[in-house]
């Protein structure tokens, strides 16, 4: 996008803010606009203005709402929920580790999806080392490709890493992923993933729950 268009959007936002009229939808759309145009710092400021009353300030290197207690935004730095045939993704208030909900997905055995069940853009600092952790619980997850956590550079190259996929039936297993942010990278995409299988028996069935996701800078 041209600089003139970015400046015009900024002036329009400032005018709207002065009038005291921005809605939550306005905040989220403008936050998305700033992220898309490479202004993660500005987007973070807008995001924190939106959530200032909830005392839930987001800082670089932190996952937003790792216990799934906030409404899903599908925009900004919030959770973005995926879609694919044969997959139902929802917040589960019955099976959880902490808080009100876990993220759950049910696979009906009809498809072989390559899907991010949920993902979010996380602002980070280049050259810094971080650890992502979370808990995954499964029930009768089939195929050789199960559920894993993944990080990759957002609008930058040189970073893609993931945990080992979890299959079968298991109680809550802690997953940990360490990574260093490459030069020039201002944000990552963190995802809860299932990759498509290349096996003949590749149609996945079963259920999965994910909860208590965290990200912290390492010394």
Q: How would you label these PLM feature ranges?
A:
Residues 1-219:
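Extracellular and organelle-lumenal recognition/adhesion modules and their flexible linkers in secreted
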């Amino acid at each position: 996008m041209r600089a003139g268009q970015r400046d015009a959007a900024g002036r329009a936002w400032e005018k709207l803010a002065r009038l005291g009229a921005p809605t939550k939808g306005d905040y989220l759309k403008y936050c998305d606009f700033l992220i898309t145009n490479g202004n993660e710092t500005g987007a973070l400021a807008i995001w924190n203005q939106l959530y200032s009353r909830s005392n839930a300030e987001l800082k670089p290197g932190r996952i937003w709402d790792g216990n799934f207690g906030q409404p899903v935004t599908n925009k900004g730095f919030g959770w973005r929920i995926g879609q694919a045939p044969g997959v139902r993704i929802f917040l589960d208030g019955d099976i959880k580790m902490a808080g009100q909900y876990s993220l759950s997905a049910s696979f009906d055995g009809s498809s072989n999806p390559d899907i991010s069940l949920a993902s979010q853009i996380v602002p980070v600092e280049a050259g810094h080392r971080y650890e992502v952790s979370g808990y995954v619980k499964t029930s009768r997850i089939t195929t050789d490709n199960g559920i894993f956590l993944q990080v990759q550079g957002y609008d930058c190259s040189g970073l893609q890493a993931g945990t080992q996929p979890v299959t079968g039936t298991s109680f809550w297993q802690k997953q940990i992923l360490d990574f260093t942010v490459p030069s020039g990278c201002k944000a990552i995409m963190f995802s809860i993933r299932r990759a498509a299988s290349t096996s003949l028996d590749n149609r996945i069935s079963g259920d999965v729950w994910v909860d208590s996701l965290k990200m912290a800078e390492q010394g």
